[in-house]
Amino acid sequence: MGKFYQFIIEQREKHMEERDERDAPEVAACSFIDRQAVGGKSAPTESPPRLQLPMPALQLLRLDHAPALLAFERENRAYFAASVPDRGDEFFAEFDTRYAQLLAWQAAGTDYLHLLVAEGGEVVGRVNLTEVADGSAELGYRIAQKAAGQGLATAAVCKVREFAATEYRLSRLRARVTQDNPASRKVLEHNGFVAGGSLTLNGKLAMSYICELR
């Protein structure tokens, strides 16, 4: 998937350069193009000539995603634990029960849980909207270690932000990031999130972010 990630980097740099030249605050256009639209609806598509491998599909969580998601969490457990609290052995022991609860929350409309699914069905990332209420939701994401640092997070968050406004009819997204995670802060800032007040998150100094969609 190296060519895909190189394409993401090139597209992000291109959009950042164009934005700087315009000296305008607009958020760069999404460079992530999903192959399977959320809810079965059509989504904007592009066919960049340099792209020779399929991009990961942005998909809403389904029952049949369970094995791939479990593998994703297991393979990246130590990597994730370096920046966020470890889920603990209990999470994996009770995965089936917890997974069913996630699907129930999504069916109830309180959560929109997205996976980045590569060719072959491998999960390489998650971008979730949780605590959906009154036109607002909390955004959170995690990307596989082998896919980190390549611009995939920025592109995926951009696409979910679009879905939040158009598919889910939300007007505001919230996010929280610890001060020792500058990469995540950059992802949010590239996607139009504005820093708010400081807070404590899992015992660490953190910052709240807001993105107005309307």
Please place each PLM-identified region on the residue numbering:
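Short alpha-helix boundary/capping motifs
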Residues: 97-101, 108, 167, 192-193
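Acyl-donor (CoA/ACP) binding surface of acyl/acetyltransferases
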Residues: 1-68, 72-79, 113-214
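A short helix-loop-beta-strand connector motif used in the catalytic cores of GNAT acetyltransferases and
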Residues: 90, 101-115
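Conserved GNAT-fold acetyl-CoA-binding loop/helix
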Residues: 79-101
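Generic, well-ordered alpha-helical segments
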Residues: 61, 72, 90-97, 108
